[in-house]
């Protein structure tokens, strides 16, 4: 049986651009794409921490080292420049593979520089 698990995420990315008339997508600094284990044209989910919006789009590459996070097309209506977002990708896998799976988690500062990386999320304490 296949299950769907978190593959990789960019946590607390800061939107640097919103381009309504650009082809729909999310342009992400190519270095960050690689670090989070994402791929060009891969479907991603966006969770806007500032306004609660949740939507799907796909990855396009922005210039490496630019720290760009640009929401394009219709997705530009769901964010404001400066909003903090979570960008997540998921993958389907067999349960045996899921037992060994480690997601690529990238935690960002407000300027989209890398704060830290991990492959685990601590247990939430009550």
Curated annotation (Swiss-Prot):
It is an enzyme of class 4 (lyase). Its EC number is 4.1.1.11. The modification Pyruvic acid (Ser) is found at residue 25. Substrate binds at residues 57, 73-75. Pathway: Cofactor biosynthesis; (R)-pantothenate biosynthesis; beta-alanine from L-aspartate: step 1/1. Binds 1 pyruvoyl group covalently per subunit. Keywords: Autocatalytic cleavage, Cytoplasm, Decarboxylase, Lyase, Pantothenate biosynthesis, Pyruvate, Schiff base, Zymogen. It is found in: Cytoplasm. Its cofactor is pyruvate. InterPro entries: Asp_de-COase-like_dom_sf, Asp_decarbox. Heterooctamer of four alpha and four beta subunits. This is Aspartate 1-decarboxylase. It comes from Teredinibacter turnerae (strain ATCC 39867 / T7901). The gene is panD.
């Amino acid at each position: 049986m296949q299950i769907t698990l978190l593959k990789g995420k960019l946590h607390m990315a800061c939107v640097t651009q919103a381009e309504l008339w650009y082809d729909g997508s999310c342009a992400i600094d190519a270095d960050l794409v690689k670090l989070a284990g994402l791929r060009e044209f891969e479907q991603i989910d966006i969770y806007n921490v500032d306004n609660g919006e949740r939507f799907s789009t796909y990855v396009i590459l922005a210039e490496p080292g630019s720290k760009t996070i640009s929401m394009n097309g219709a997705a530009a209506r769901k964010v404001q420049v400066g909003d903090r977002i979570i960008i997540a990708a998921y993958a389907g896998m067999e349960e045996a593979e899921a037992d060994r799976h480690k997601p690529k988690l990238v935690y960002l500062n407000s300027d989209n520089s890398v704060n830290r990386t991990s492959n685990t999320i601590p247990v939430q304490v009550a």
